[in-house]
Amino acid sequence: MAAAQAVEEMRTRVVLGEFGVRNVHTTDFPGNYAGYDDAWDQNRFEKNFRVDVVQMDEDTLEFDMVGIDAAIANAFRRILLAEVPTMAVEKVLVYNNTSIVQDEILAHRLGLIPILADPRLFEYRNQGEEEGTEIDTLQFRLQVRCTRNPNAAKDSSDPNELYVNHKVYTRHMTWVPLGNQADVFPEGTIRPVHDDILIAQLRPGQEIDLMMHCVKGIGKDHAKFSPVATASYRLLPAITLLEPVEGEAAEELSQCFSPGVIEVEEVQGKKVARVANARLDTFSREIFRHEKLKKAVRLARVRDHYIFSVESTGVLPPDVLVSEAIKILMGKCRRFLDELDAVEMD
């Protein structure tokens, strides 16, 4: 029985010890363990695989993906970072820039501003094309001039009161429709995601006047096209109490973990520790600093249970980004199968 439990732990758990991490390699391949049928089976995979949405709001999404290998999870993460397309500033035509920010630095800043535009409605611009069209380009104008405020108090030293337009924000960017874009996109739908991003600061007499061309691209070409601020995953924590922990030791144990992981209950007049929500733990391994407690707890992670966290830049909702990443991964698989079918067998 103990041997079977040890094998099951090696197959399904990554164990965090005091001086190292065990079972880090995937070992559930055919023939590795006697009595285990680890051969690939489509029906079994479909039965065990699931996706559970845990939390979602306007910009963030947390979901569980269960029943997959690390290679698939990491491929999915990399697609979110580098292969889901967005629209971003690619070319900046500077007509006048008398601010202290150099033209090339200003253009770089503008490129990193997330643009609220659905990239699925646009095409990639063909390489070598200089002039954009309504199907592959968005155009923005930025024209701001700083002047003195004639109504400012004489003893004021606050630039916000002394000057007009001394701070250039993304709200100053004006969309200039190309072709029939004004008919396709309602007013206010094409704009920077946030209107309070500071671009530059001016002083009286200084001016920025330029035109921006936004094109469709992917993060693999440039990070400005990446649709996510963060896209990460971690394995589901599995914390097990190997022996009862009571009294002051229970309180001490709860302090070794993230809030909410260990709860202390009153049982027959005694304080008793129990694992309440292992998911919340960050695995600081603080428990191994306490000689009396470290043997009472086993820290592990479930090998095939991935907790994904996706934070959108605001260009698209996070659930849309995830669905687009799934489509891209499916397309890669189809192309791979087509290549295999095209190979002539000897």
UniProtKB/Swiss-Prot annotation:
Family annotation (PROSITE patterns): RNA_POL_D_30KD (PS00446)
HAMAP family: RNApol_arch_Rpo3
GO cellular component terms attached to this protein's record: cytosol; fibrillar center; nucleoplasm; RNA polymerase I complex; RNA polymerase III complex
CDD domains for the chain: RNAP_I_II_AC40
GO BP term (any one): DNA-templated transcription
Pfam families given in the database record: RNA_pol_A_bac, RNA_pol_L
InterPro entries listed in its UniProt record: DNA-dir_RNA_pol_30-40kDasu_CS, DNA-dir_RNA_pol_insert, DNA-dir_RNA_pol_RpoA/D/Rpb3, RBP11-like, RNAP_Rpo3/Rpb3/RPAC1, RNAPI/III_AC40, RNApol_insert_sf, Rpo3/RPB3_RNA_Pol_subunit
Family affiliation: Belongs to the archaeal Rpo3/eukaryotic RPB3 RNA polymerase subunit family.
Modification type N-acetylalanine: residues: A2
Organism: Mus musculus
Keyword vocabulary terms for this entry: Acetylation, Cytoplasm, DNA-directed RNA polymerase, Nucleus, Transcription
Domain of life: Eukaryota
Protein name: DNA-directed RNA polymerases I and III subunit RPAC1
